[in-house]
Amino acid sequence: MAAPRHHHLALAVALALLVVTAAAADEGGPRGRRVLVLVDDLAVRSSHSAFFASLQGRGFDLDFRLADDPKLSLHRYGQYLYDGLVLFAPSTPRFGGSVDQNSILEFIDAGHDMILAADSSASDLIRGIATECGVDFDEDPEAMVIDHINYAATDAEGDHTLIAGDDLIQSDVILGSKKIEAPVLFRGIGHAVNPSNSLVLKVLSASPSAYSANPKSKLASPPSLTGSAISLVSVMQARNNARVLISGSLDLFSNRFLKSGVQKAGSKIRHEKAGNEQFVTETSKWVFHERGHLKAVNVKHNKVGETNEPGMYRINDDLEYSVEIYEWSGTSWKPYVADDVQVQFYMMSPYVLKTLSTDKKGVFSTSFKVPDVYGVFQFKVEYQRLGYTGLSLSKQIPVRPYRHNEYERFITSAYPYYAASFSTMGAFFIFSFVYLYHK
């Protein structure tokens, strides 16, 4: 009977170690590593293997499923099974299992991330998901982006739908600090971004000479999408910091485009490798929060010269405020360095607005005097910067007036009133004395 006991004990210890190890692995990063990859053809797994290998090499656990799998589900027993979604199924008319457009949008609303790639065969389902994320693909189902000037030289005899794009967003947070030198190959459909929507950004835009139309037919009317208004790849960061990348080209992520050389039409410079591999690697790092993710910890406030946080301040108190902000580097949390983080001392409107100074070790701090107004105030930090997750910090604190025994015994500004009072009493005494005793 001893052997079974030892066997059960060893199994229990192994399971405990597995749980502890998994918890330790998840504790460090801002996001989990479970990613569902939906494809409409399992051949995509091999034709886009370099991109998937890049994700797996960075520690992501990919679960490949056909988009119409009848057992497909994003959650079970109220818990999501995945932390991210790669949707490489542009032609699928409906998803299998319990997955539909609403469940994917709920997945994003729950704070999860998604990469969506479409092409000229994009179904209404894929177009609908993209629309809900803030971008509108060309309504013409036969349309593709055409550029008779900025096309790849290998497409010289073709219909000029193989675009060599180099109009990239200027953001080291989204695209990395190393500049993408080579043009990015793109063949697919364009989309429009509402300029009033501050949550969506164009990452790769078409050139002014591009337009969206059916390459197999002559133009009967002016195209609805033209020039730089056409976005080839866009990203969206929701208010809950969920991130979405939408590409009008599935080929953008393919092995063929990632490993292909590129030469722009009319240019003498030939690049041995297109910018696709660097582009999709860097943008996927941003989408899955390997870069540009901030966290704030240890929010503190206290009176100057003290360390304990009071439950209430008095008007005109001198106080100190500090917060620690860190940025995820992909492997660890590093101190965030910036000179534009501000704190508000807020009641209906900001009474105090101060820029926080940093020690470049992650600590941001400032000091100020409590305004001569009592009520319920808030320390507020609202930090929104391009490419970074937003920080919204709020801490409530009441401010009271002076108590009766806390005022100065004699107020300097009241001396004229003191003099007036005593002079009035003196004059009345003299008047009374003269009136009573003078004959």
UniProtKB/Swiss-Prot annotation:
The keyword Transport does not apply. Residues 1-24 form the signal peptide. The chain crosses the membrane at residues 417-437. InterPro entries: DDOST_48_kDa_subunit, OST48_MD, OST48_N. Its main location: endoplasmic reticulum. Residues 438-439 are cytoplasmic. Residues 25-416 are lumenal. Pathway: Protein modification; protein glycosylation. It is a single-pass type I membrane protein. One of its GO terms (cellular component) is oligosaccharyltransferase complex. It is found in: Endoplasmic reticulum membrane. It holds the Pfam family OST48_MD. One of its GO terms (biological process) is protein N-linked glycosylation via asparagine. The keyword Cytoplasm does not apply. It comes from the Eukaryota. Keywords: Endoplasmic reticulum, Membrane, Signal, Transmembrane, Transmembrane helix. Subunit of the oligosaccharyl transferase (OST) complex that catalyzes the initial transfer of a defined glycan (Glc(3)Man(9)GlcNAc(2) in eukaryotes) from the lipid carrier dolichol-pyrophosphate to an asparagine residue within an Asn-X-Ser/Thr consensus motif in nascent polypeptide chains, the first step in protein N-glycosylation. N-glycosylation occurs cotranslationally and the complex associates with the Sec61 complex at the channel-forming translocon complex that mediates protein translocation across the endoplasmic reticulum (ER). All subunits are required for a maximal enzyme activity. Belongs to the DDOST 48 kDa subunit family. Component of the oligosaccharyltransferase (OST) complex. This is Dolichyl-diphosphooligosaccharide--protein glycosyltransferase 48 kDa subunit. It comes from Oryza sativa subsp. japonica. The lineage of its organism: Eukaryota, Viridiplantae, Streptophyta, Embryophyta, Tracheophyta. The gene is OST48.
